[in-house]
Structures are given as structure tokens and as C-alpha cells.
Amino acid sequence: MSTSSSFPRTIVSYTVTTSLFIVIFLCSVFFFTRRTLEPSLSPYHTADIPLPAVDLPPPTPLLPQIEPHDGDVTVETNPKEVEDSRRGGDDVAVETELKLKDVEDSHTEKTEEEEEGRGESPGEVSVESVEHAVIEKMRGCDLYKGSWVKGDDEYPLYQPGSCPYVDDAFDCQRNGRRDSDYLNWRWKPDGCDLPRFNATDFLVKLRGKSLMLVGDSMNRNQFESMLCVLREGLSDKSRMYEVHGHNITKGRGYFVFKFEDYNCTVEFVRSHFLVREGVRANAQGNTNPTLSIDRIDKSHAKWKRADILVFNTGHWWVHGKTARGKNYYKEGDYIYPKFDATEAYRRSLKTWAKWIDQNVNPKKQLVFYRGYSSAHFRGGEWDSGGSCNGEVEPVKKGSIIDSYPLKMKIVQEAIKEMQVPVILLNVTKLTNFRKDGHPSIYGKTNTDGKKVSTRRQDCSHWCLPGVPDVWNHLIYASLLLQPHS
């Protein structure tokens, strides 16, 4: 009887226990299901899950900074988690996003610094970034008032005998000159320095352009120097050549050298006076030269296409018939029986200036006028026994240092009245010092196999390497000072 009564109680006990277990199980399922639907409250959720970028205020200084890592930062997101986190996990999301933003910003800054560090391609580094202070100091400095100094390694800009474009008449070392101090002088303006010459940077500035030198044999002297100094900036020197296949000779008056890697040209156009030379026939049928001082030189059509022009005239105005002025100077159809050479020079420069004003676009073209280059004849002139041999260093004192010919004052007057700006390469006084720089007896030693007499010395032109290299250095410095060089 007692056994049958205890059995129902056992069943009831098991039933209660089972029911309680089921209730606890269902509550647990409900509880954990809710936690799963709210990940921001889940104990399994961490701040390491990447979140999307959102618009947030800047981070406060109290937040930790994460060091940048190489490579791109990629953030993958789940749309469901994004929506849930916005509803329940704002604090954690903000901290995570700020850390990711710091990584991206640091990576961006590092990339920009690396790009700046790379600079331009090798061989085309502009000296403007390296010698900015030197260039700025040149502004307001008279580049043509100074002295010649030596002792550093900058000059010569190329070694004697290394440049195949030097005329025999200017190749003094090959022609037997043994002293070499004249090669090592550089020009130092008072109050500033010229930027160090950079041939490659010069070529970069000439990229796609034409540089043309127009004038007499003094400008050919400078033209050959220009070819030589620019050649030093080429890694492959075979990429420079005369487009017509011509060798440089005294008799030819037009050369075009192409620099393939920079798509630029350097040209020379011979024009002794910049105005038109002609001839007239006399009663006996003979012809005599004339100079039309009111008409521009026949070569002017070539000038128009150049981007940078360097003009000169001067030395031919002191020779024979030009200086005498008898039945030589012409205006219109009238030939003057006698005319003053200085006045003819003035009118010729006005003719040139007028042509520049009417034909040059200053927004696209740049014009230089290279001033008179000093000669140093002793005991005569070029055709009357004048000499300069034996000079081995620059003039240190004397009246010649401050000598300034009337021709240069006329040049300055003409330029001042022009509408198109012209840069005057006023090399007169700096060449006054350099009595040691001329070929003298070390000019061209033979012509057609015949030895040239040393009784006629060249004290007008310059040995190369030599003084004209400085003229081209001054052109380079002037280009650096241009607002859009």
C-alpha cells in the first residue's frame, strides 16, 4: 500500500523537474538569441572588426595613435553589422574608425613625402631647387660688375680638345699653346654669385625650343662655345648633330644643331651688321659693297622662328671701308658719298630695334643682345701688326678695365626705346680684363696645307674653352631669373 502511494509522488517529482528544465532551456534560448541579434551587446563582439568610413569629428588628443603600415588599407564590411553597430555600438565604432583613419592619413602623408623625395627624373634635376638662395640673391645684383677668380673646380666647363665643334682658329691648346691658367678663371659678380652651371638643366629649359645666335664671327665664337657646354649635359653625345651634315667652317654662314633627346636646336646665322649688305656697279662696270642702314638683313626670315635670340654686331664697324664711310652707306636708293660710321651704327641699330618690335612676340620669344667684346692689340690693329702673345693672366689695373666704347652707349639707348624687352649681355667690361684669353699666335696654323703667318695675330676672338663660356653661363643665369624659364 505504501509502495503504490509513493509511485505517484515520484511521477510528480519527475514531472516538475522536467518542466523546470524545459522552462530554463527556453529562457536560455530566448536570452542568447536576443544577444545574437544585438552584436554590440554580445560578449563575443570585439573592437577588432573593421568598420566602414563615416563622417566623424576629428580625433581628440586622448585617443591612441596607430603607426602607419606599408601598403593600402582595405576595409571590408557587412551591411547587417553596419546597421546594428550604428544602433548599439557607436562608441566602439568611433574608436575603431578613428584608428583606421589614422592609418590611412599616415599612409597618405608617407606616400606624398616619398613622391616629393623622388623629385624629377635622373639627369633633369633643376638647380632652382638646389640653389634657390643663390638665384634669389642674383635679383637686383649687377651680374656684369665684378672680377675674375680662380681656384675652384667649375672651370673649364669642358676640357680642351674634348669638343669636336671648336673651330681650328679657336682651338689654342691643339695649336700649341702650353700655358693653361687662362682656362680656370670664372666670373664673380660683386655682391652675388652666378649659379653653378648645369648643362642638363640648361637643355631642359630649351626642350622643344630653338636658340639662335645671329651676328658676326664673335657670335660664331660664342655659338661654338654654346655647343660645347651643352654637349657636356648629354649622356649619349651621338644624339647631337648638325642637321645638314655640315662641319663648322669660317666660310659657311648657317648651322643648325639638333639635340634629339630634348627636341631642341641651337643655330647660328651669320649677319655682320644686322642690316642689309649689297653691291653697286660703278661706271667702269666694277662692283663695290654697300650697306643699307635702313633695311634689315636678308636672313631675317630665319630669325622669326626662333624662341630665344642672341644678337650682336660691332667689330666689323671699325674695319676699312665701314669706318671710312665713302660711297658705302645707303638709305633708300641714295648712297652717301661720305657718312659718319658712328651715326650709321646708330641708325642700323634703330632699324634692328624696329624689326624686333614689329616681329617678335615677347610672350613667346626671348631676345638677348650681347655687347661689344674687347680686343687687346698692342702696337697696332689686327691688320697692322698688333699683337697680344705672351699674355698669361688677366689685367689687374689700368684704364682699360673701365673702358666703355661709345658703341655700347648707343646699344643701351636703342634698347631703352624698344617696346619688346631685350636682355643686354653687357660683357664689355668683363672682357676688358681678359687680355690673356685670345688665340694670339695660337689661332689657325694652316689653310689648305699652307702655314699661316704668325705676324698677324688674333687678339679679338677667344680661345675655347675660354671667355665665351662665361657669356653662355650668363645666359643660363638669365634664364633662371625668368618667371617662366
Curated annotation (Swiss-Prot):
GO cellular component: membrane
Location within or outside the cell: Membrane
Keyword Membrane attributed: yes
Topological type in the membrane: Single-pass type II membrane protein
Domain of life: Eukaryota
Ranges spanned by the short sequence motif DCXHWCLPGXXDXWN motif, renumbered to the chain: 458-472
Chain positions of motif GDS motif: 215-217
Gene Ontology molecular function terms on file: O-acetyltransferase activity
Basic and acidic residues bias locations: 67-110
Region ranges (Disordered): 65-127
Membrane-crossing residue ranges in chain numbering: 11-31
Keywords from the UniProt entry: Membrane, Signal-anchor, Transmembrane, Transmembrane helix
Family according to the record: Belongs to the PC-esterase family. TBL subfamily.
Note: Contains 2 motifs that are conserved in esterases, but it is unlikely that this protein belongs to the catalytically active pectin esterases.
Record function comment: May act as a bridging protein that binds pectin and other cell wall polysaccharides. Probably involved in maintaining esterification of pectins. May be involved in the specific O-acetylation of cell wall polymers.
Listed name of the protein: Protein trichome birefringence-like 5
Phylogenetic lineage: Eukaryota, Viridiplantae, Streptophyta, Embryophyta, Tracheophyta
Name of the encoding gene: TBL5
